[in-house]
Amino acid sequence: MPRSIAREQDVLKLPAPKRPPSRTSRRIGIHTSIAGGVENAAERAYRIGCSAFQIFSTSPRQWQPYELARPACDQMNALRQKYDLKPLVIHTNYLINMASINDHFLAKSTEAFRGEVERA
């Protein structure tokens, strides 16, 4: 198992915070991995004491998105509700350039951006 994924899995083994993140208007979070399922991102954020988190909804370095399973998304949303994790921020992939002067690249960027919005 790659080292970074092992670390991500280790976070899931952490005990729940002794004191849940405070429920204030000020939120602090991290960009967390969706490795092992999108629902794990919410669990990781909670376990380290965050009140918000950010994810890539698909690979940040590829045009071709992968589908997120509806049950996993529902589970993530249930965990967000349970742990009061909000907002969830979706980071678009690195390839998107909505200012491109290349028509082909702009079309791919537009399609990828729309996909990100739909997954959000």
Where are these predicted regions, by residue range?
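N-terminal pre-domain/capping segments
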Residues: 1-92, 96, 100-118
